[in-house]
Every structure is written in C-alpha cells, then in structure tokens.
Amino acid sequence: MTNYKLIDDFLEKNLEKSINELSWLVTQPSVGAQNLGMKECAELVAEILTARGFSSEIQATGGAPVVFGERKGKSNKTLLFYNHYDVQPPEPLELWDTPPFEPSLREGKLFARGVSDDKGHITSRLFAIDALLAQGELPCNVKFVIEGEEETASEHLHEFIRDNKAKLKADACIWEFGGVDHRDVPMQYLGLRGICYVELSVETLGTDVHSGLSGSILPNAAWRLTWALSTLKGPDERIRIPGFYDNIIPPTARDREIMDALPDVADEYKRRFGAKGFIKGLTGGIDLKMAASATRLAISRYTASARTSPA
C-alpha cells in the first residue's frame, strides 16, 4: 500500500534536485517552429528516462523525433503519459528580463522558455515517479510518449501512433499539463476542446497600387477579406456558418452542476486579462462558466502584405 506521507517527505526533501533537472532541460533550446535543437533535446529527454530505469528510444518521424519510454510495475495495468519537449519561439527577446534559455530563479519561481509548457510537466511527473520508486516498485506499468511537434500542430504524431499501436496500449492516459487555479488549488481536467484551424487568403492584384492613384477603381484585398469575415459571426455572438452547431452535444444537468460547484472566475478573468467586462452582458456565475467552455469561433491573426513587380 502506498504511503503518501513518505511521498510528500521525499518530494519536499528532493525539490531542489528536481528544479536543477528542469533547469538543465530548459537550458537546451528546442524551438519547433525554427527546427532549433530538436534532436539534442530529444536525446536529453531519453537520457532522463533511462536514468530512472525506463527502456527509452528515440523514433524518427518526418519532423522532430518522438521519445518513447516504458518501465514495468507491479500490476498488469498501464498508465500512459503524453508530453512534448518543443517550445514556442522566445521572441521578442527584449521582453525577457533574463535570456530565455538561461533559467533564473526569482521570488520562488523559475523563469525560462519551456518551464511551464511543457518541460516542467515532464520533470514533475518524473519527480513523482522518483517518489514512488523510493518506496519500491511502481504500482503499475508506466509509459511516456514525448513528442517534439506539439507547438506546430503535431504534424507527424499520427504516423508515430499508426506505427506503434501495440506499444501505446494502456488503461489510461494523462495528457500534457496540469496546474492550479487562482486559489492555488490543483485542478484536474476531464477534457479539452479540439481546434479546427482555417486560413483564408485573398489576392486581388498582381502588384502594389498607390491608393491615391488607383485605389478608387481597383478591388482591395483587405476589404474583401473583412467583408468575408464579417459574415462568420453576428453581433449577437452567434456563429453563422451553416451547420456549425449541428453535432455539438449540449451540456447535461450534471455538467452544469459540476461547473456550478467551481469557484467564480469573473474577477480573476478581469484581473488576468485586463478586461472591463464580458460579452453578452455576462457578469459571472454559472452562465459565465458555461460560456467560457462553449464552442467558439475566433480570428487569431491578420497578415497583410503588398508586393511590387520587379523592374
């Protein structure tokens, strides 16, 4: 039987060791969008798995490699962890108080690119495994899948899954992150929304045009795109794409009951995002919580460019 007091004591006693391991891991750049340091970081991840008695391997894909690790436990049950070692680009660098790949411990917090997303979750899970191993065998088989393309839409993960179905068999899987809410209470997520990303492109002319000369007689791409986007959603916040809501499963009474039991987030959202209020006159309570988890449509970025034909 697991002795949770011994686990807590181990974690407290070895916290500095875990922070040092995380610091070592985030020192290695692994910027997926720039293909920077991916192979090197995969090797480090495999190394820290091997150091804990995991059989680990690095599998090549059409992009960044995937690290797979496995260690047997006392039971025939298997728990699978998913994580990723790639990080977002650190730019703009001038907004950093310290270099992004030089970890800095300030006021009890570690700052570096990847500390939160997602290298800290890799090392914290392994830290928990250390605490269990200090008491003997693991209670179940444990597997890790740690990829390097999460920040770039996991383009080749499906290939890895297709080719390794037998290896990936498990009784349960824990996804990449966890955390605490604004009260520092640990949160357990039961699911997340998926995403469908669509890129719209409009081109109306073959060359750049001076607005003062021909802007009144030639079609403008920016306006065409603006008009198109304005048809997607109305002032009432309802999405106007035909069939968009057809297969969405509405929340059950039990879903609402669970959400209602969670603390109100209105003041925290205003503070965190600098918002004065919410859409549709929402002020808080269960309606705001349900709206925050509802299906949505967002415009994430505009990019405009003009090109001039060569002379």
Predicted regions and their residues:
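Acidic/His- and Gly-rich active-site-bordering loop/insert found
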Residues: 2-115, 132-138
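Generic secondary-structure signature for well-ordered alpha-helical cores
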Residues: 16, 27, 31, 50, ...
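Short, glycine-/Ser/Thr-/acidic-enriched flexible segments
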Residues: 86, 179-181, 205-207, 302-307
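Short small-residue beta-strand/loop micro-motif enriched in glycine and branched aliphatics
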Residues: 110-112, 206-212
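Acidic/histidine-rich catalytic neighborhood of metal-dependent amide-processing enzymes
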Residues: 116-191
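Acidic-enriched catalytic cores of C-N bond-cleaving enzymes acting on peptides and small amides
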Residues: 181, 190, 197, 211-302
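Flexible glycine/proline-rich, aromatic-decorated loop/lid segments
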Residues: 187-203
